[in-house]
Every structure is written in C-alpha cells, then in structure tokens.
C-alpha cells in the first residue's frame, strides 16, 4: 500500500514533466544542472537572508529530485530484462563452445598417449642397439689385440737377435742364428703372432747352444793335437 501511495504521489508530481517513457540522458542531465544551480541559489539566499526565494528554490529542488527518483523507480524492469539477456547469451555461447573445449581437452590426452607409446617402443629397440655397440667394441678390441701381438712379436725378435749376436762370438753361430730366425719368422707369420714369437725364441736359443757346443769341441780337438 505504501509503495502504491508513493507511486501515485510521484505520478502527480510528474504531471508537468515529461513521461518516463520519453526520458533521455540529455533530459536527466538538464535536471541535474538545474538542481546544481538551485542548490547554489539556496545557499546564496540563506547568506543574504532572502527567505521567500530560498523556500521557493527548495520546493523546486525537491520536486526535481522526486521526479528523478520516479525515473529511477521506473527503470529497474528494463535493467532486469537487460541483465537477463546477457545471461541467456552467455549460456548459449557456453553451450556452443563446449564441444571446442572438449576437443581441446582431448588433444593433450592424445598427445600424451602418443608420447607414452613412443616411450614403450624405444626399449624394444634398445637391446638391438646395445648388441650392435657390443659387437663394435669387441671388433675394436680384437683389432687392438692383434696389432699389439704383432708389435710384441717384432720386439721379441729384435731382443733375441741381439742376445744371439752377443753370445755366439763366431761367424758360424751368427749365420746359423740368422738362418733359424728368418726361417722361423716366416713360419710364425703364417701361423700367428704368438706362436711365431715362441718358435723364434726357441730356435734362437737352440742356435746359441749349438754354437757354444761347437766351440767346446773345437777347443778339445786343439788340446789333443798339442799334446
């Protein structure tokens, strides 16, 4: 009842003004400017002691304020309708963009699945790669051992030849040693680095012992002839 009474009072006050349906922002701005001027006039009237003019300006200011209040009361239904429209629009747009969001969410899942499948596929290839690496390492090690064995065979040959040359003391012993060394070196080259070096050392030592025994017999023969 009170609200209806207030609405009737507002309508009575708005009789001499424009109806709320024709209200524009320019009209509201005019009322605000007029109210500002009325307030300044009221203050001036109070300072100068003009009571009648002050009362008249106050009544007009109150009338304008009531009119603006009535306009404000008539606006909420329209604002409510406007507020409902964006909400409906948002709901429709949300329903429209839901498939796109679901597709965007499924895209990372598919990427994760692809990555996991790649991770599981890599260990299947790793044993083959390890085997190839082991074979390559073994082949490299065999080449290194073969080259090392050949080098050691030549060093043994050189050492035994020098020992034989120092211990023989005669041309026959050196010639026998050289013959045995070169012949055994030829055999060792065909049979392998390790076996060749062993046979070379044995033959060289045999040649040295033969040379020493030959020298002993020669000395014994000379002693018997002298006696």
Swiss-Prot record:
It is found in: Nucleus; Cytoplasm. Signal peptide: none annotated. GO terms for biological process: leaf development; positive regulation of DNA-templated transcription; seed development. InterPro entries: SS18_N. It comes from the Eukaryota. GO terms for cellular component: cytoplasm; nucleus. Disruption phenotype: Reduced plant height, and short and narrow leaves. Keywords: Activator, Cytoplasm, Nucleus, Transcription, Transcription regulation. Highly expressed in internodes, nodes, developing spikelets and developing anthers. Expressed at low levels in roots and mature glumes. Residues 124-139 have a biased composition (Low complexity). The keyword Transcription regulation applies. Residues 124-160, 188-227 are annotated as: Disordered. Plants over-expressing GIF1 exhibit increased size of multiple organs, such as leaves, stems, panicles and grains. 'Makiba' means 'pasture land' in Japanese. Belongs to the SS18 family. Transcription coactivator that plays a role in the regulation of meristematic function in leaves, stems and inflorescences. May regulate leaf size, length of stem internodes, and seed size by promoting cell expansion. Transcription coactivator that plays a role in the regulation of grain size. Component of a network formed by the microRNA396 (miRNA396), the GRFs and their interacting factors (GIFs) acting in the regulation of meristem function, at least partially through the control of cell proliferation. Interacts with GRF4. This is GRF-interacting factor 1.
